[in-house]
Amino acid sequence: MNPLHATVLGAIQGLTEVLPVSSSAHLILIPWLFGWPESGITFDVALHLGTLIALALYFRRDIAELVVNALSGLTGGAHSSATRLPWYIIAGCVPAAIVGKTLEEPIEAIFRANPAIIAAFLIGFGLLLALADTLGSKKSRMDQIDLKNAMMIGLAQCLALLPGVSRSGITITAALFLGFSRETAARFSFLLSLPIVAGAALLKVGHLVRHGVPEGELQPLLIGVGVSAVFGYVSVALLLKLVQRYSLYPFVWYRLLAGAGVLLFIFNQ
């Protein structure tokens, strides 16, 4: 992989892993559209690490607070929504961890080579996001999340294995349907994604440690980490500011246009 491809794909990963537009769809469709070779698992590691760095840096205070609250609850401190939230996040990650470990490879094998289905998922789940943003009451706050809410959002996260769905998109959609505000939905979505992204990164780092970095891949790998981290950090900040003032319809329209554009490209080939 050359440095230009690494930069473009790093930027795409950083932006689309966080925004509700599906990083997996973009990382499959962009190389397919331009005829680029597949990036491979080494570069996959770089992209996941970059995203993890961005999320960990942006939510460093939230993470520290979650750890303190979890320990407080374990050591006899007063039980509250704050001390329970870390455990709700962990519980919400369990379904996606199990499904991901079991089905990630067969799902990727089925859908990676089918851009039309990916485009259909972009459109279909974009419409679902629009419906949630329109019908959701948007009243509930972070301190009102309970185990049932966390598990329902966590179950929805399992659908993110399908390229074109979007991890942040489907969890924000589920949270909106459950009545949470846009900001709470987005923030909880990111906190819920941290253990999953970290787990995926660690699994792929393990593969990298066992097999080593292929010759000539170190520079693109480092570029991928850095670029995806920078763009990921910026896009988290951007999304959290946007949802405080505006609807999620700009992302819905983007998904519809991107999906329709891919379908038109396929049918005109």
Curated annotation (Swiss-Prot):
It catalyses: di-trans,octa-cis-undecaprenyl diphosphate + H2O = di-trans,octa-cis-undecaprenyl phosphate + phosphate + H(+). InterPro entries: UppP. One of its GO terms (cellular component) is plasma membrane. The keyword rRNA processing does not apply. It is a multi-pass membrane protein. PANTHER family: UNDECAPRENYL-DIPHOSPHATASE. Catalyzes the dephosphorylation of undecaprenyl diphosphate (UPP). Confers resistance to bacitracin. This is Undecaprenyl-diphosphatase. It comes from Geobacter metallireducens (strain ATCC 53774 / DSM 7210 / GS-15).
